[in-house]
Each structure stands twice: as C-alpha cells, then as structure tokens.
Amino acid sequence: MLKEKTFFFITTMIIVLSVLMTACGGTSSPNSGAPTPKEKETTATEGMRSFETKKGIVRIPVKPKRIVTDFYGGELLSVGANVVGVEPTTFKNPFLTDLLKGATDIGEPISTEKTLQQKPDLIVVMKDENYEALSKIAPTLHIPYGTATNIYETVRLFGDIAGEKEKAEEFIAAFDKKAAEGRENLKGVIDENATFGLYELTDKGELWIFGDNAGRGGQAIYNALKLKMPHAKNKAEEQTLKLSMEMLPQYAADYMFLTTYDPQNKGEALKQLQSSAVWKNLKASKNNTLFYNDFDTFYRYDPIAITGQIDLIVDMLLEGSKENKK
C-alpha cells in the first residue's frame, strides 16, 4: 500500500513539474512564434515611411507598387515607378506612349471613383482639388507645380517618392551623357555666341516667350545644350512673358523655335503671324533659322521628354545648317 502511494505521489510530481516547465518555456523562449508587443508594432508599420509635404507629414509606402497621379506620369516613369493611372493629356505625350500602355485615364480633375478602381497604394498630385477625398483612398502627396526647378531636382524628388533613388541617379547619369554628346555634335556648327528663343502662339493670337523651366524645350536647349537665351531674356525669374508685336524684335533670337497652341487646328493665328511685316523681317526668318515645333512634343517638361528633346533639337539644328549651306 505504501509503495503504491509513493509511486502515485512521484508520478503526480513529475507531471506537475513537466507542465510548469512547458509553461515557462512558452513564455520565455526567444524562438517563440508569437511576436512581442514591439514586434507587432514593427510588423504593423513595416514598409511605410514618413514624407514631409506642405500639407504635413504623410505616411507612404517605402516601395509603392501602384501609383496614380495627375500630371506627374513622366516624372514617376523616369525612375521606374509603376504608374497605373494618369490624367488624359498625358497620353498625348509622344515620349510616354509605350510606357503608358498599362495605365488608365483617371480624369482631370482626378475622379475618385476611377482612382479607387485602380487600387493605388500611393497618389501623387500637382493639383489638390480632391486631396481630402483622395487621401481616404491611399496616402496622397501634393507636390505643387514648380517644387523642383530643374531636371536634376525633379528626378531626385520623384526617385525619393518612388523609393528608387538608385534609378534616379542612373537616369541623371544617362541624361548628362546625352547632353554632353549633343553639345559635342553642335561644336563648329553653331556659333557659340548665337542666341536661341522659345516662343508660343495661342489660338487667340497671343505670343509668349519662355525661359529654361517652363516646357517648350527650355531645359533641353538652355540647361542641357547650354545654348544662350536672347539678351533681353536673361532674367531667370521671367519664365514666361507675353509679347506684343512691337516688343518681339527686342526679344528675337538668332534661332527661334515656335510652338502653336491651336486645339481645333484652325491655323488662322499662325497665318496671321507669318504674314506680318514684323515676323518676316526677323533675322531668324531671313536666315532660315526659324523652326516650327509640334506642340504636344515640345510642351512637355518631364525628364523623359526633356531627354528626347535633346536629340530632336540637335538633329533640327544640324539639318538646318546643312540646308542653309546648299
């Protein structure tokens, strides 16, 4: 009887001790599958970071996978981002045609319904009309026009946003190489003191001159190829200036590039300009150094477009030089 009680007691103690050891091991083992509170916090915020904007700090994905934007399609594509939605006129950008094959027109202003359908994890906008509504769909960054003032700032800004800083630097290196090649190709062809002007005619007959950071090929001509502005247009703060016909000779250049904003293709404003005595008497008109550029091609100012414009401008000048020698 005593032996049976002793055996029972020993067996019971072994079971109790085993249970206690298992319980202790479950709460203290460093290899336990259950995360600690700190680990849970890390897991919840994994893949997100803070990005400072004028509207405050926004939590965005470290590597966004699906981005919707209004006017920053080219900027984001230049650093390899996956753009799934853009505003409609971006599709007219000839430099982005192949890159936008999988993207959707999300309207302008951006349609919240169309944006929601794209399931973005990041939204980047130039205009902030629907900012609050868009912010409820995905983290939204408002980057106002003019935040970056040249191609280098632009590419690095959007490389940061897209989590692609290395690709941004690769793009810049390729851009610098192309710009250097373009300058080399123009040596001995273009007088180093020659001036180059960018002009635009509207369908209302208004004539404008542009600086180095307002599209129309400005960054390609002035920043990449290092060509000179007309002497009266050397003020950096004057990115656009409306000209009267009386002012035009003062702002004329040795080489002049004209784009025409004429959405209905009437052609009336251009005919009137070309028939004017002032236009006919310009040095560029007489010397055949006046170029008429496609609006959709040269209006663009994203990094991909600027890079493409370098080749177009160099080819234009080289061909023009050959023609003038005949």
Language-model region placement:
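Alpha-helical, coiled-coil/dimerization segments enriched in small aliphatic residues
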Residues: 90-94, 208-240
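Short helix-initiation/N-cap motifs at beta->coil->alpha
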Residues: 53, 104-112, 235-244
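Proline-aspartate-enriched helix->loop->beta-strand connector
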Residues: 115-125, 139, 248, 252-256
